[in-house]
Structures are given as structure tokens and as C-alpha cells.
Amino acid sequence: MIIKIIAGAAFLIIILIILYTYTLFQAQKSPLNSPANFLKESAQSKNNKTVVCIGNSITHGRVSYNYVNILSDDLSGHGYHFINAGINGNLAYNVVKRLDEIINCDPDYVTILIGTNDANASLSKKNSVRYMNDMALPEEPNENFFGKNVEELIFQLKKRTNAIIAILSLPPIGEDIDHIAYQRTKEYSVIIRDVAQENDVDYLPLHENITEYLISENHRPRLSYENGFRRIMINGFLSHFLLGTSFDKIATSNGFLIVTDFLHLNHRGAKMVADLIKNWIFK
């Protein structure tokens, strides 16, 4: 009897490991319109304008509603080709380290949405250590580290491309406007705005637009960051990839209007990003 129980438990553990591994694989799959795939294609239309969207998982669009796909669906027929240069977990430092591939795409436009992980890393020592290990950071992630890497990112893009550049302020972490996590994204968005002004690139006020929307809805979120954002985030990944639950349903089940799990976006949030970029391109 004991042997059967042990065997059953072992089988269950194996199944759980397989499901978790499958979820991680799905979450990390590269988008079809990645820089690498773009560069492999032998014939790119010379008539299309190339738009590279730089970012982290919010741009990557596997664990967050894919705003790059919204842009591609809306504008590909208008002579624009969108490249998804988002990679899960990236901080501004990581983007600087992989700029060569992006620059090789010879973009006409570049949008930058980076800093959510930088802000999240600064919220606790535990977060900081995890990001330093997982993302091979050379120093502790803080405001200075973020600011200098955003500045270097823009400097290299201006020096090595002829692209028109826009950088977006950050979506909030969570939806409690008074919480330190939300306020930290506001602080990092101020850094983004200042760097944009100092380097003469366009600034797109995503954080401000989301805040205005949440205030207009008189929204009071049900969950707090302290409820365990990583557990809530991983549960959302499992629900999406194993059960097919939409990002909108995940957001609703967690009591959110814009984010799904504190860090990532539902359709409403992704559309706010896409609308800002679309209006900027057509200005």
C-alpha cells in the first residue's frame, strides 16, 4: 500500500514538472516577428517602414497581451513592418547588451518600453538578488543603474541608426495608486521622461494615461503586491497556457482593469500602448 502511495505521488510530481516545464517553454517562445527572424528573411519589402519595438515580457507578448501584434494587424497594410524585440525578464541593461541585432534591422522607427523589471527589482532585497542572478547584472539594480542604461540605450540607437525614437513611460506595478510598487513605476517614469528630454527623443505618457483611466474608474484593487505577486503571476501563466484562459479573464479574476498579475497587461492595457505608438507614428 505504501509503495502504491509513493508511486502515485512520484507520478503526480512528474506530471506537475512536465506541465510546469511546458508552461515555461511556451512563455519563452520567440515571436515570429523577432529581429533574428527578420534578419533571416531573404526578401524584405523595400517599400515598408521598419518599426522595432524594444522591451521585456510586456513587449514579447507571450505572458502579456501582445501590443506589437495589435500594431501589426492595424498598420501592416499601411506600409509598416513591425519587429518584436521584447525578451522576458529584461532590464534596460540587458537591452543594451543585445543592441547589435536590433541595429542590424536598420529600423526607421524604434519604440522603447523598458523598466518594469528595473522598478520591480528595486522593491526588495530579495527581488534585487533574484534579478542580479537571473539576468546576470553587474551591479545592484537601482535608479542610477536604470537611468544610465536607458541613456546608453538611446545614445547607441541615435549614434548607430537613423531611426526616429520614442520611449514610453511604464505601466504600473499593480493598480493601487498609493502603493510603493505603483509609485516606484512613477518614479522610474520620471527618469524616462528626463532622459528623453535630455536626448531629444519623443516621450509617450503610458503611465500617465493608465493612472488617469484608473482614477476615472474610481478603481480599488482587490489584491495587494504583498499577497505574493510571483505566485499570482505564475498561476496566471499556468492558467493561460494549460487551460487557455485569456489575459482579460485572468485580469478580471484578480480584480484588475489593466494588468493581469501586477506586471503584465490585458487587452485594454496593450491597446493603450498600441494607440500611443500608432498616434506617434502618424503624427
Predicted regions and their residues:
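N-terminal Sec-pathway targeting helices
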Residues: 1-14
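Generic detection of intrinsically disordered/low-complexity segments and helix-coil linkers/edges
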Residues: 14-16, 61, 140, 197
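Non-cleavable N-terminal signal-anchor transmembrane helices
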Residues: 16, 20, 158-161
